[in-house]
Amino acid sequence: MSGRKAQGKTLGVNMVRQGVRSLSNKIKQKTKQIGNRPGPSRGVQGFIFFFLFNVLTGRKITAHLKKLWRMLDPRQGLAVLKKVKRVVASLMRGLSSRKRRSYEVLTVQFLILGMLLMTGGVTLVRKSRWLLLNVTSEDLGKTFSVGTGNCTTNILEAKNWCPDSMEYNCPNLSPREEPDDIDCWCYGVENVRVAYGKCDSAGRSRRSRRAIDLPTHENHGLKTRQEKWMTGRMGERQLQKIERWLVRNPFFAVTALAIAYLVGSNMTQRVVIALLVLAVGPAYSAHCIGITDRDFIEGVHGGTWVSATLEQDKCVTVMAPDKPSLDISLETVAIDGPAEARKVCYSAVLTHVKINDKCPSTGEAHLAEENEGDHACKRTYSDRGWGNGCGLFGKGSIVACAKFTCAKSMSLFEVDQTKIQYVIRAQLHVGAKQENWNADIKTLKFDALSGSQEAEFTGYGKATLECQVQTAVDFSNSYIAEMEKESWIVDRQWAQDLTLPWQSGSGGVWREMHHLVEFEPPHAATIKVLALGNQEGSLKTALTGAMRVTKDTNGSNLYKLHGGHVSCRVKLSALTLKGTSYKMCTDKMSFVKNPTDTGHGTAVMQVKVPKGAPCRIPVMVADDLTASVNKGILVTVNPIASTNEDEVLIEVNPPFGDSYIIVGTGDSRLTYQWHKEGSSIGKLFTQTMKGAERLAVMGDAAWDFSSAGGFFTSVGKGIHMVFGSAFQGLFGGLSWITKVIMGAVLIWVGINMRNMTMSMSMILVGVIMMFLSLGVGADQGCAINFGKRELKCGDGVFIFRDSDDWLNKYSYYPEDPVKLASIVKASFEEGKCGLNSVDSLEHEMWRSRADEINAILEENEVDISVVVQDPKNIYQRGTHPFSRIRDGLQYGWKTWGKNLVFSPGRKNGSFIIDGKSRKECPFSNRVWNSLQIEEFGTGVFTTRVYMDAVFEYTMDCDGSILGAAVNGKKSAHGSPTFWMGSHEVNGTWMIHTLETLDYKECEWPLTHTIGTSVEESDMFMPRSIGGPVSSHNHIPGYKVQTNGPWMQVPLEVKREACPGTSVVVDGGCDGRGKSTRSTTDSGKIIPEWCCRSCTMPPVSFHGSDGCWYPMEIRPRKTHDNHLVRSWVTAGEVHAVPFGLVSMMIAMEVFLKKRQGPKQILVG
């Protein structure tokens, strides 16, 4: 038994070691097998595929993987990647050839392709803490594995990649959350953004079709007759020129038609050639004959100066006894080398659009591009909640920025008055043939430095011209606008008001870029941003009415105007007639061209002298063939024939009606019957109207009616334009009261005359005389008289010393009382309890019209009364604008008549106007700055001022009654209740006079400010209470008076000590504090004052409560308990009544029904 046990004994075996030994043997066998295979091992291939998978799916590349990649044999790695490349190329060829493959093969290849890269599709790039998903149009509706989750894009706007791209967040949604108002979303992965290009296959991006509504330039041009852009008159003018040339040159016209017929091979070519030749024909006209508008100066003595204003496309013919006639015209007005002032962009390109968003209650969204000057940004709010990545419903912050690049711009050049050249053309009427005219044409150039110049004509002497370039067209408020190859003269204010991006001429960032960028309404996490299309069409349409300018094509920076005028003086004393000693031509002459109407009331003819030259050609215009007295005027004075067979051009001015033009003497004379339409009286009226039109265009530079000179030297408006200077010349020596009495007598006589024609004539003359005696000459432009404290602007005048007239001589009305009552009702219903006036003028309107507004409210059964309280000339700021009207009110005649007699009663609700801030109606619940002056009307005794409501809240004061002017070293900023006069001393502007009649808290607008480069702390009067932000609002040694006694109105600032006090400069004096009155609370004078570094004499405020010192000047020995301190914390007008116009209406009543003297006096 023991033997069996020994024989069957079991031995212990270590199975772990046995398994390791077995596995080791297998690995050695497999390694040997792999090593014997050619090419990269499967391990290398697997590692490369795994590495590519991590790269393409956006997984993090660990440090261990990077180390293995660096250890990889380059030859084996390249071999694997080449295989991958061959597989991808094969798949692409298969797709392009549309061949059918087996399901198994396609499955394997697509799996490999998905691991490598969906070629041409999505790519994932890590950008800081963000994963950036780049997609194209091929990825519409696809879902991609990103990190530990997946993202889906459904972006219809995604196309081909280009600089016009979008980038924004892909919200991360909860697992069961459905997307809402988003086109990119993720599940299980944070911080993913999507980017895509928006260009089509041709590289074009979508633009907004919206056109900008630009203000038209019409009625903003220069005050001159001109060729205007898009007025539709140029074709008409050229046709008129062609018509006149055809009538006057029939032989050449027939020749042109014959050439066209022979040269052209078909009818179309013949018509085109004929039109081209005929269009060029008028260019060969000369003298003033072929010019549309022409004026004559007749009967002027040659030794005196003749005043004339020259315009382009017009001509003046000067005739004097024993002098040759002279044609002068303005050839061109050119501007040399203007400086570029600004650029206006009308076509922009947007690129690199980025958007960021935030959920509600998580703060504001921000982009780094917001701080870059070349980006247009918009910040707004979008609806967020479940379905777009937010846990709370509400408004979330969203901001979008796009890089702005201007593709096309219009340059604006500033015109330097000293660089303007006027080219004047002068030509003598000597009867020479057209081919010899060049010798008789002289060209003179005038600029700002030119004096008088002489035009010398061989054999005839010299004509002297002196042109006042400084008083010609005013370019100070104009720019030259150049857009591609076209140029215009435009109004400076119009150009600055264009709603287009702009930059200064020296470059820099574009301002107001938002005008060419359209931000569509936001979605949850994105905003569509589009560039507006090319606005060239809108801009050219807006330029309607602007004067055309032509740029010189030879490379110079010279611009030629198609309009303009210049005032000149002409002297003919050095001109002499040629051939006065020649004998008369007696041989038979002939008409080469029969007498033809020039269109200016004259007749022109061409006469041929066969022999007997040199001789004088006798020409006369008579009533009949037997008359011997010349009834016409020779424009071509003393026509002479220099050689035999000479052809002489002669121009005459026949009388009105039938006449005969007689050339030569005796039986061989030439006769031609002539008829001139019109009459001498009609000519007088025509010339007067012509002069009136010219005066309206020229202003004070206009010479006279019909170029006669010296009768009308200045203009106003209306009657003053035509009759003003004549009235002054006839009655200038009479006193004012005498002229008024004469006018009244003429009206009285006219009323009592039985003959209707004489009655109307006398009344008209009397009314004109009284009007010219009592009215204002309506000055144009802006001017300021510092001695009289008078500021003139536009056609209005206001005088500060008479500023109380704004409350006494002016009546204030709402533009529409019913509308204002409706606005009061709407505002009250929205919880606004009242209104604070901006200044005394608005308060006066409410005070005088409260009853009328209450009557309207009462008629419509509105339980509200407008209650006007006394503000003591202190007008503080409210916080709301007017509410818009929801329903209109009615206002009948019955209520109107009742309101004239009875005042409406008080209602339960009160709309408080001004007064103090009380608990029932605090300033925080009042309307403010919601009325502006609309226009100025006329009345018999007072001027009416109409105010209209505005619905936008603004801090700026109404600019309708503000003015600013500078003249040399003096300047002024003024309004009806404020005047600040400044002067310059050693290069520093300082206030010398400051007066204010009321306290107001609107801000002086920059549009009515001179010298805006100033730190607000260096100003004297604070900005928040109407102090102009100007370097002229400054007093050396005194800072901004935020605690000045500004409420002590009326207030005047003077450079003098308060009565009974003295001020010394002491470095140990107290610092700035609240302004202090010079007397104690008991009225005792505080004699001693000091300041640390103020300038002398000291500044003092003289107000309604005594004299005050500014914040820098402090009392020396008075206890604080007795001081009185300031409690302020400042954070086109017709000046003369025009009511006499209504008298003319009343005259019609008198004329229709005869009134006796007694009835007139009583009635």
From Swiss-Prot:
Residue span(s) of the pro-peptide: 102-121
GO molecular function annotation: ATP binding; helicase activity; hydrolase activity; protein dimerization activity; structural molecule activity
Gene3D superfamilies named in the record: 1.10.10.930, 1.20.1280.260, 2.60.40.350, Flavivirus envelope glycoprotein M-like (1.10.8.970), Flavivirus polyprotein propeptide domain (2.60.260.50), Tick-borne Encephalitis virus Glycoprotein, domain 1 (2.60.98.10), Viral Envelope Glycoprotein, domain 2 (3.30.67.10), Viral Envelope Glycoprotein, domain 3 (3.30.387.10)
Organism domain of life: Viruses
Residue spans, topological domain Cytoplasmic: 1-104, 266-270
Keywords, alphabetical: ATP-binding, Capsid protein, Clathrin-mediated endocytosis of virus by host, Cleavage on pair of basic residues, Disulfide bond, Fusion of virus membrane with host endosomal membrane, Fusion of virus membrane with host membrane, Glycoprotein, Helicase, Host cytoplasm, Host endoplasmic reticulum, Host membrane, Host nucleus, Host-virus interaction, Hydrolase, Inhibition of host innate immune response by virus, Membrane, Nucleotide-binding, Secreted, Suppressor of RNA silencing, Transmembrane, Transmembrane helix, Viral attachment to host cell, Viral envelope protein, Viral immunoevasion, Viral penetration into host cytoplasm, Virion, Virus endocytosis by host, Virus entry into host cell, Zinc
Residues covered by region (Fusion peptide): 383-396
Residues annotated as glycosylated: 134, 150, 908, 986
Gene Ontology process terms (BP): clathrin-dependent endocytosis of virus by host cell; fusion of virus membrane with host endosome membrane; symbiont-mediated suppression of host innate immune response; virion attachment to host cell
Record region (Hydrophobic): 38-72
GO cellular component: extracellular region; host cell endoplasmic reticulum membrane; host cell nucleus; host cell perinuclear region of cytoplasm; membrane; viral capsid; viral envelope; virion membrane
Site (Cleavage): 101-102, 121-122, 210-211, 285-286, 778-779, 1130-1131
Pfam families linked: Flavi_capsid (PF01003), Flavi_E_stem (PF21659), Flavi_glycop_C (PF02832), Flavi_glycoprot (PF00869), Flavi_M (PF01004), Flavi_NS1 (PF00948), Flavi_propep (PF01570)
Extracellular membrane side: 126-244, 286-730, 752-757, 779-1163
Disulfide linkage: 288-315, 345-406, 359-390, 377-401, 467-568, 585-615, 782-793, 833-921, 957-1002, 1058-1107, 1069-1091, 1090-1094
Residues that span the membrane, as ranges: 105-125, 245-265, 271-285, 731-751, 758-778
Domain remark from Swiss-Prot or TrEMBL: The transmembrane domains of the small envelope protein M and envelope protein E contain an endoplasmic reticulum retention signal.
Name by which UniProt lists this protein: Genome polyprotein
Taxonomic source organism: Yellow fever virus (isolate Peru/1899/1981)
Lineage, top ranks: Viruses, Riboviria, Orthornavirae, Kitrinoviricota, Flasuviricetes
